Regions:
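Membrane-water interface segments that mark the loop-to-transmembrane alpha-helix transition
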Residues: 10-21, 59-109, 122, 126-129, ...
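Transmembrane helix-bundle signature of multi-pass secondary active exporters and lipid flippases
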Residues: 44-59, 237, 241, 249, ...
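Membrane-interface junctions at transmembrane-helix termini in multi-pass inner-membrane proteins
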Residues: 8, 135-159, 348-378
Length: 427
């Protein structure tokens, strides 16, 4: 009887979860556009871009903890003290970040939301603060998923994540029918409050379980010393991947912002499936590295990259053939006239992401982050300059040019070269 690898079982549940989450986000577009209108929805879209920025609210503790759990599991040792220490650190992070944003929201929103009417700009500070608080809670709560994946219980993480987004979608549907003229604030709270609250509830129960565990200062020190590397890498990666939102906020019209973000959500649904595989594969790679099973590790990675690129190509063809039908379902009445060149560029971009994200995951599972600290700032600089320049001349296509160039000139070749170098030295 063929035994299915556990990481693929977890990945399968991740696929279902990611499909539900991405589907909820896509279907929500129709309701949110009707509630908010085009310009307010464009503001809402830019604010939701902050979700990725505040994913670093866990200050790298989530990834640090995940690797410690995987390593201690491989050695059959308890890791309860690490979980308790991580929760203490995360609580402090939540308080500090929330307090800081209380004072900075007005200034930051005035820089970020500049291309809209005076009425929207006058309320932008409160919108920015509410979004920030919600996303800080989500960022801190995401440590739950790291813990569960490290314990090879990723299916539980997927259930929590999918359920939270489903509840958020039901909230959006409710305000669509009961409060059709709701503000951006109501829309943000409706969609994202459940996503913020459910993981925090789980963390609370998990903390009760480890409450009597003793934690010494060295545990905090170990978590923080390793987390700093993940924090730096995550921050740099976010700058790379979210520069398009900054450029959009300054260079694109409200209509083009909606067109770009909805298209990326559609492709994101496809790419979520591959990221689910990587998420499930991380602890597996960490354990194989500890056990020095390099041949098995290399085979898994090779097969995943080949499968990922093939899947991106097939998915792009499917989206292109059915694009008129897909866009009409998401938001009927909005002009989504997008050239074939955009779809080709998106296929190239996400294929590059398959390659780069896989090697980035490998290096993180090995705690080898120095190359990322060196190369990702170069990528961020190239991406920011090229996207700003090309968006000025080519709009949406220009943003994609910049994204592709930033990856191709840096991490596309740098990460695999460094991985092979390190794996040979450790073997």
């Amino acid at each position: 009887m063929v035994r299915i690898p556990r990481h693929l079982i977890i990945a399968a549940s991740s696929w279902l979860s990611k499909i539900i989450i991405a589907g909820v986000q896509l279907v929500s577009v129709k309701f949110l556009l009707e509630i908010l209108g085009e310009e307010s929805y464009a503001v809402f879209t830019l604010l939701t871009g902050l979700l990725v920025w505040f994913s670093i609210a866990d200050i790298g503790i989530g990834s640090s903890l995940q690797n410690y759990i995987s390593e201690l599991k491989a050695d059959r040792k308890s890791y309860d003290a690490y979980i308790k220490a991580a929760i203490h650190i995360l609580f402090a992070s939540l308080i500090i970040l929330s307090s800081t944003l209380f004072f900075l929201s007005d200034k930051l929103s005035s820089l970020y939301l500049t291309s809209f009417s005076d009425e929207l700009k006058n309320n932008s500070g409160s919108y920015f603060f509410i979004a920030s608080i919600l996303f800080i809670f989500i960022g801190v709560g995401s440590v739950v998923y790291k813990i569960l994946f490290a314990e090879l219980l990723g299916w539980k993480a997927n259930i929590i994540n999918a359920l939270s987004y489903l509840l958020g979608f039901l909230d959006v549907v409710a305000i669509h029918y009961l409060m059709p003229d709701s503000s951006i604030t109501f829309a943000l709270v409706a969609l994202y409050a459940p996503v913020a609250i459910l993981p925090i509830i789980y963390i609370s129960f998990r903390y009760i379980y480890v409450l009597k565990t003793k934690v010494n200062f060295n545990t905090y020190k170990l978590l923080l010393s390793r987390s700093s590397g993940f924090l730096i890498f995550s921050s740099l990666s976010i700058i790379v991947l979210q520069t398009d939102y900054i450029v959009m906020s300054q260079k694109l019209s409200a209509a083009d912002i909606i067109k770009y973000t909805v298209t990326m959500k559609i492709f994101g649904l496809m790419f979520f499936i591959y990221t689910a595989v990587l998420q499930a594969l991380w602890p597996v790679c960490a354990e194989l590295r500890v056990k020095m099973q390099w041949g098995k590790l290399h085979r898994i990675i090779f097969l995943n990259i080949i499968g990922g690129v093939f899947f991106v190509g097939l998915g792009t063809l499917f989206i292109y053939v059915l694009k008129d039908y897909i866009y009409s379902i998401i938001a009927n009445g909005i002009d989504y006239n997008i050239s074939g060149a955009v779809f080709v560029l998106l296929a190239v971009y996400f294929s590059i992401r398959v390659w780069c994200d896989t090697f980035a995951m490998l290096l993180q599972s090995m705690n080898q982050l120095k190359i990322l600290w060196l190369i990702v700032p170069c990528q961020a600089l190239i991406g920011g300059v090229t996207q700003w320049y090309f968006a000025e001349h080519y709009g949406i296509v220009g943003i994609l040019y910049g994204l592709i160039l930033s990856f191709s000139l840096t991490v596309f070749w740098g990460l695999p070269v460094y991985y092979m170098y390190k794996s040979k030295r450790l073997a």
